[in-house]
UniProtKB/Swiss-Prot annotation:
GO terms for cellular component: nucleus. This is Protein cubitus interruptus. The keyword Metal-binding applies. The gene is ci. Residues 139-152, 333-347 have a biased composition (Low complexity). It comes from Drosophila yakuba (Fruit fly). It is found in: Nucleus. InterPro entries: GLI-like, Znf_C2H2_sf, Znf_C2H2_type.
Amino acid sequence: FEGCFKAYSRLENLKTHLRSHTGEKPYTCEYPGCSKAFSNASDRAKHQNRTHSNEKPYICKAPGCTKRYTDPSSLRKHVKTVHGAEFYANKKHKGLPLDDVNSRLQRDNSQGRHNLQEHNIDSSPCSEDSHIGKILGTSSPSIKSESDISSSNHQLVNGVRASDGLLTYSPDDLAENLHLDDGWNCDDDVDVADLPIVLRAMVNIGSGNASASAIGGAVLARQRFRSRLQTKGINSSTIMLCNIPESNRTIGISELNQRITELKMEPCTAGDIKIPMSTNTAIEVFPEDLLQNHTTFRNTVLNKQGISTVSGSVQGQFRRDSQNSTASTYYGSMQSRRSSQSSQVSSIPTMRPIPSCTTTAASFYDPISPGCSRRSSQMSNGVNCYAFTSTSGLPIINKDLNA
């Protein structure tokens, strides 16, 4: 300003000085009903504290000094004149903030923080969980896992409730209340076969490939289960494993069943089995030879080797259907295998073929259906037949004289 030669180190001080030349007073009194305005905040604070209240919030921070002032300008003047410019330059003379709404809240917070410091409790929000974890962690290791859960329920509210709650409980009480249960003793490997049928079905559904690995998985699981029983000193033969269905108990019967199914699906007439024989030499076969060869043939079927060509001089051509074939008769009785496996095994040697006639011509009929008659086919084709009759279940050839 023209005619003024004052200099200031801070821009704010220069602006405040310029207001004295311009007459600008942007700081008005905040007290209700008071309309006084001031050019700087220091003068306004001095007015409010002196006129509208008797507080002196600005305290000298010098050691041993108890002076209090209503405005910061009076405090600065006191520090410069009494304690020296060096003490003022270190900014150790700053007092408390103004006596407004924000300053009151800040003073309340500082007072509550001071009370917490007297109890050796850190009131910062970041250290609430860690401090509770430290207190709980000194009781026992099992409480450490519960400290994170309990800290969320005991958060500090202005630093008062948390201190009261922690002082009412001792570490021993926390250890008794927050003691964890003992861990369950679980087996490392749980076999699917050991589970009940309902749970095992659910496991198979969830796996997605239960149909492909049901038989192999059940066998392996059953072997592991029996080996574990033997290591524990338990006789597995005396234990009834009724809940574990054995889908492959008799391997020979299953393989024989599979072999018969393959023979049925071969490119023959609807599953009929043919053994090539010569019609010229079939008449010359003796009943004893045919009896021996047929016995060998039936034993071969039961020994899981399939049905092969009869050795020896039997080369006549005949056909076996579901009524005169041991293998086909067994296949017909295989339908009752699901209900009883023991009756399936016992029914093999007691079955006897029923006399019927076979033809050399191919006919499309169901070999399993017992109601099919071969006599109509015999009459239509007009071919000679050989009757196989036996009381012991073995066929004997009778020569047809009409041939």
